Curated annotation (Swiss-Prot):
The active site is at 209 (proton donor), 324 (nucleophile). It is an enzyme of class 3 (hydrolase). GO terms for biological process: polysaccharide catabolic process. It comes from Oryza sativa subsp. japonica. Its EC number is 3.2.1.78. Residues 1-31 form the signal peptide. GO terms for molecular function: mannan endo-1,4-beta-mannosidase activity. Substrate binds at residues 95, 208, 284, 366. The gene is MAN9. This is Putative mannan endo-1,4-beta-mannosidase 9. Its main location: secreted. Expression not detected.
């Protein structure tokens, strides 16, 4: 896709020119907000930047730090961030963790790989140059890049008797490991700005997709979220905090809205924690209701979004972001046209909410990859240069979202 985008045809050439010029000016204003030190805030059910409403569109690229840590692959990270700016996206979500294993950020508790940290420095600096905000996730629930499993193993290596990976949420040892993770106070060696003082960071995410199957009551995760959200805020009061939830309901209300099971989270109770600034959901009906038809899966997604948008406004009174959604090429009946239609359906729901002053203020699809990353594919990847129709859908949403933000 590069720096090109599809022009949506309007009745007259003059209107087309004015619309494109307005969108460019809006993105230039958002870029200036990042450059001029404007932190994103949550105000009621809206995000604001510099006192003005802020709406977002963008994507996930979890691998940015990893690729940027290798000078030979750094262009992949820079190229994808440039694509985001060219599309007039405003927000990218990525990992600020890699625990143990091959080329880690954190080799062992509190011991860091400077090359990997320099990769994260580079990502933040490049995002800032392009007027992009970043959501940085601090640890993984899953085994990829270490995750809670690695934290538990580190505790065991020190002689602590932890039974399951879910003890990550309960053990004082692993909780201290988490608190000691030095990302928040890192001083970027490219910009000279501490992460906690850098407005390029939109929000900290406590953990990617937390689940606690050993305590489906939700009490374990509720206690952990309360403690860690408060801790992150105590170290960094400048930035917003979100949990990283997929959106599964729990004991407080609406368990019947789940896709047939619970995972130890509680969308309502977890997000009502005062130190949590906004709610998130993910949407993967091709996984969660895999036995349903494509039409039934899309219907589930529509209801999933509508329920969470309503509850974010009426119960939480906080903004909502769809921080992951996608459609896998490995799903039955997949076509690029079907994926594009799914993206449009998600985007229409996001846009309708944002336009009408609802709680949902943006969506980030999973995920963008750069050319030459074939070994990283998971079925959900979008290589924008090779997926023109999907890139057009994304560009159209970016333009619509930009049009909602006052100049």
């Amino acid at each position: 896709m590069g720096s090109k985008r599809r022009v949506i045809l309007l009745p007259t050439l003059g209107v087309v020119v004015l619309a494109i010029a307005a969108a460019v000016l809006l993105h230039a204003g958002e870029a200036a907000d990042v450059a001029n030190g404007q932190f994103a805030r949550a105000s009621g059910t809206r995000f604001t930047v510099g006192g003005r409403p802020f709406y977002s569109n963008g994507f996930n690229a979890y691998w940015l730090m990893y690729m940027a840590s290798d000078p030979g692959d750094r262009s992949k990270a820079a190229g994808v961030l440039q694509q985001a700016a060219s599309l007039r996206a405003t927000l990218v979500r990525t990992w600020a963790f890699s625990d143990g294993g091959y080329r880690p950020l954190q080799k062992s508790p509190g011991v860091y790989n400077e090359d990997m940290f320099m990769g994260l420095d580079f990502v933040i600096a490049e995002a800032k140059k392009r007027g992009l905000y970043l959501i940085l996730s601090l640890v993984n629930n899953w085994d990829g890049f270490g995750g809670k499993k690695q934290y538990v193993q580190w505790a065991r290596d020190q002689g602590h008797n932890l039974g399951s990976d879910d003890d990550f949420f309960r053990s004082d040892v692993t909780k201290q490991f988490y608190k000691n993770h030095a990302v928040l106070t890192r001083v970027n060696k490219i910009t000279g700005v501490a992460y906690k003082d850098d407005p390029t960071i939109f929000a900290w995410e406590l953990i990617n997709e937390p689940r606690c199957q050993s305590d489906l009551s939700g009490k374990t995760l509720q206690a952990w979220v309360t403690e860690m959200a408060g801790y992150v805020k105590s170290v960094d009061p400048n930035h917003m905090v979100e949990i990283g939830l997929e959106g599964f309901y729990g004991e407080s209300m609406h368990k019947n809205f789940n896709p047939g099971y619970t995972v130890g989270t509680d969308f309502i109770a977890n997000n009502l924690v005062p130190a949590v600034d906004f709610a998130t959901i993910h949407s993967y009906p091709d996984q969660w209701v895999s036995g349903a038809s494509s039409d039934e899966q899309v219907a589930f997604m529509r209801k999933w979004m509508a329920d969470h948008i309503r509850d974010s406004a009426a119960v939480l009174r906080k903004p909502l972001l769809v921080t992951e959604f996608g459609w896998s090429a490995r799903s039955n009946g997949y076509t690029v046209a079907a994926r594009d239609a799914y993206f449009r359906t998600v985007y229409d729901a996001v846009y309708a909410s944002a336009r009408e002053g609802g709680a949902c203020a943006g969506g980030l699809f999973w995920q963008v990859m750069a050319p030459g990353m074939e070994s990283w594919t998971d079925g959900y990847e979008v290589v924008l240069e090779r997926s023109k129709s999907t890139a057009d859908v994304v560009a159209h949403q970016c333009a619509r979202i930009a049009g909602l933000s006052p100049a």
